[in-house]
Swiss-Prot record:
It comes from the Eukaryota. Keywords: Disulfide bond, Glycoprotein, Milk protein, Phosphoprotein, Secreted, Signal. Glycans are attached at T133, T143, T148, T151, T157, T167, T169, T178. It is found in: Secreted. Residues 1-20 form the signal peptide. The N-terminus is blocked. The gene is CSN3. Belongs to the kappa-casein family. It comes from Homo sapiens (Human). This is Kappa-casein. The modification Phosphothreonine is found at T157. Its main location: secreted. Mammary gland specific. Secreted in milk. The record marks F117, I118 as: Cleavage.
Length: 182
């Protein structure tokens, strides 16, 4: 868009000069001497890059002018890219990364939602308000305490331990079986 406006401005500034030259070529040479009236004199050639500086309404350009260069040209310094730093020759060369134009925000910003986007459930209208009844006069029932048997802590000696093993073996009892007599 900038280049288009620049071309239009250049044409607007140069067309009057070109039109004067074309009109001068069409007029027959009726003057014996080469003198022309003041309004018909051709202007000297002025390079285009001097013209905008002579007019005050152009002013200073606040935006940086960049020449048109091929994007994939590796010899052009890129101001918005991080140049890869290679410390060791066997290290992988990182890809160029985009850097942000400004510092990242330190605080996570919460989106401000418009009230129409906030979902508020509609209130339910109840016909009857149910109040739970609480019995304030409650009978206290005693809780039975579990019967516990007293436990005896005893120190086991190796002799007593071996005796307890011997005595804990099941004894075999012999019962005399007599055949029934009829």
């Amino acid at each position: 868009m900038k280049s288009f406006l620049l071309v239009v401005n250049a044409l607007a500034l140069t067309l009057p000069f070109l039109a004067v030259e074309v009109q001068n070529q069409k007029q027959p040479a009726c003057h014996e001497n080469d003198e022309r009236p003041f309004y018909q004199k051709t202007a000297p050639y002025v390079p285009m890059y001097y013209v905008p500086n002579s007019y005050p309404y152009y002013g200073t350009n606040l935006y940086q002018r960049r020449p048109a260069i091929a994007i994939n040209n590796p010899y052009v310094p890129r101001t918005y890219y991080a140049n890869p730093a290679v410390v060791r020759p066997h290290a992988q060369i990182p890809q160029r990364q985009y850097l942000p134009n400004s510092h990242p925000p330190t605080v996570v910003r919460r989106p401000n939602l418009h009230p129409s986007f906030i979902a508020i459930p509609p209130k339910k209208i109840q016909d009857k308000i149910i109040i739970p009844t609480i019995n304030t006069i409650a009978t206290v029932e005693p809780t039975p305490a579990p019967a516990t048997e007293p436990t005896v802590d005893s120190v086991v000696t190796p002799e007593a331990f071996s005796e307890s093993i011997i005595t804990s073996t099941p004894e075999t009892t012999t019962v005399a079986v007599t055949p029934p007599t009829a």
